[in-house]
Amino acid sequence: GKSILIHSGTGGVGLAAIRVAFAYGLDVFTTVSTDEKKNFLLQLFPQLKAENIGNSRDTTFEKMIMERTRGKGVDFVLNSLAEEKLQASIRCLGHRGKFLEIGKFDMEKDTKIGMSAFLKELSFHSVMLDKLFSAPDSMKNLLKKMIDNDIKSGIIKPLKTNVFPATQVEQAFRLLASGRHMGKV
C-alpha cells in the first residue's frame, strides 16, 4: 500500500488530511508537538499506530519514518514544517515520492533544495491555501464537487473547533501563539 507523512497532525489541515488518507487506504504517519496532541490523535483515529507518530519540533521523525518503512520512505509528504525539518521531510520520501508543500516560510525565504533529492525522481508541488480563494471558478467548482462527494460519503467530517466570543479575542490569539490548540480556532 501507499504511505503518507502528514505534519502537524492536530491542526485543521492535518486532521482533515489524516481522515482523507485513511479513507483512501493509505498507511498514515504524522507529527505532533506534545504527548497531549499524540493522545488526542490516538483517541480520534483508533487505526493510527502510536509508533507512527513523530515529533514535529525536531528531525527525529525522519529516523522513525525510515525505521517504520524499512528504509523505503513514504510515497507522499504533506509538509508544513520549515528549515531543517523541511530537509528531513524531503529525505523521508521514497523513490518517485511526491512532496506537497503548504507552508510559506521556506518559499518566502527562498530555501534551497539540493538537486540530489531528484535522484529519487521526486515530484514537488506547492499549494498556497489562501490563493484558492482567487483561483479560477472552474477549479473552485471542481474542488467543491470533490468536497461535497466526500462529505456525502462520510470521508470528510466536521473538525474539532474552539470558538471564542469576541470579548475573548486575546485569549484566542494566546492559544494560537502557544501552539497548544488542536483543530481550528
Task: Give names to the regions the model predicted.
Residues 1-184:
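4′-phosphopantetheine-dependent carrier domains
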